[in-house]
């Protein structure tokens, strides 16, 4: 089991660090009182391998509880529980700028100067910083660069390379655009199998409907251009730290055209080695509701 304790200065990026660890498959807990670390560790180690990666954020917000951290770490060591400490640091100038931009008060100086709070916090965290296995100074790091630094230390390289999970989702506009869509494409300009008597009762998953939709030059031009666009977008989304991408393709009812196109895009992405899922949200919606136009 990999057990990471994330700590550091307020404003240095602990929140972003824990999000990055969560993206890497860590079970994450924010602001756990240090006195609870031993019991939490025991519970996790008793899961018989179900939980393999854990990250805890421990910081000065714990107040007097933070002083119990070293006793808890001593207990972990004595009991044979392996752990790592990640310490997030930044310069005074950068921390002051971040606090002013966010209009937040420093936890150790809520009614005073930010610099005084930073100084007090540095003093209290000096020992834990000295014990840290990894220290990341975020003064010059953008969010993406911090994420990359976290990935470099804690990620599994094959996991990092394939971490963008893509979902291709077909839907019907009359049932509403999926709220979690990242990209939405309207294919209602394509010829509609609904008006072909022998195809109406089938869906875009059926070969006869798919063959009909894909038989038109306009369809193939659209699919080719969409695939080229995705070839450009996907690596750039990943570069900026995106880890999930939902591509929604809609027609009127979500049963014929959108399903056929979604399947074509899914197969194309899959053939290129992407981690991709397919979902046809409304494929049976009009059957259940007795709707007409698809």
UniProtKB/Swiss-Prot annotation:
Known role: Displays ATPase and GTPase activities.
Mind telling me which InterPro entries this protein's record contains? P-loop_NTPase, RapZ-like, RapZ-like_N, RapZ_C
Locate the residues binding GTP: 59-62
Q: Which family does it belong to?
A: Belongs to the RapZ-like family.
Domain of life, per lineage? Bacteria
Report the protein name in the record: Nucleotide-binding protein CBO3377/CLC_3320
- Give the residue range of the signal peptide: none
Binding-site residues for ATP, renumbered to this chain: 8-15
User: Gene3D superfamilies given for it?
Assistant: P-loop containing nucleotide triphosphate hydrolases (3.40.50.300)
Query: What's one GO MF term for it?
Result: GTP binding
Keyword list, A-Z: ATP-binding, GTP-binding, Nucleotide-binding
Native source organism of the sequence: Clostridium botulinum (strain Hall / ATCC 3502 / NCTC 13319 / Type A)
For the keyword ATP-binding, the answer is yes
